């Protein structure tokens, strides 16, 4: 089955990510633990943290990051309007490049929001 574009980016990164995890397991385990600790509810709800991460992904022009955090936003039940306003913040902070990467983030969110819940789940 052919994947939609952002699902394909996710798939394309899966093997190299596993390879890196095998090469430096301690680093990757620590990185995963950091992400888990950071993205939980605290003074900021996890949904807000996911949107912040999505905005950072846009300003860093990172397709893999956009995929991860657009999927995370969809998984956490963030609305399309919340994603759109987050993109607006990224555009305000990053200017022109965010007008290129922001639409990619919205398209990735749309793709994951329309996919079955099991496609939104994190997979090792």
Report each predicted region and the residues it spans.
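C-terminal structural segments of small proteins and small subunits
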Residues: 84-110
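Immediate flanking context of iron-sulfur cluster ligation sites
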Residues: 42-60, 81-90
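Acidic, glycine/proline-rich low-complexity segments that act as flexible tails and inter-domain linkers
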Residues: 1-48, 100-124
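Amphipathic alpha-helical segments within well-ordered protein domains
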Residues: 35-36, 53, 70-74, 88
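Iron-sulfur (Fe-S) cluster-binding segments and ferredoxin-like electron-carrier domains
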Residues: 28, 68-80, 106
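Short cysteine clusters
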Residues: 62-65
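Charge-rich, acidic-biased intrinsically disordered regions
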Residues: 77-89, 114-124
């Amino acid at each position: 089955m052919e994947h939609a574009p952002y699902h394909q980016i996710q798939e394309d990164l899966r093997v190299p990510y596993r390879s890196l995890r095998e090469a430096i397991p301690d680093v990757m385990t620590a990185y995963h633990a950091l992400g888990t600790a950071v993205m939980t509810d605290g003074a900021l709800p996890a949904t807000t943290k996911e949107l912040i991460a999505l905005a950072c992904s846009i300003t860093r022009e990172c397709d893999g990051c956009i995929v991860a955090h657009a999927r995370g936003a969809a998984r956490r039940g963030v609305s399309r309007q919340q994603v759109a306003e987050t993109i607006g913040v990224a555009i305000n902070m990053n200017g022109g490049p965010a007008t290129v990467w922001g639409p990619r983030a919205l398209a990735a969110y749309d793709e994951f929001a329309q996919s079955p819940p099991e496609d939104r789940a994190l997979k090792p």
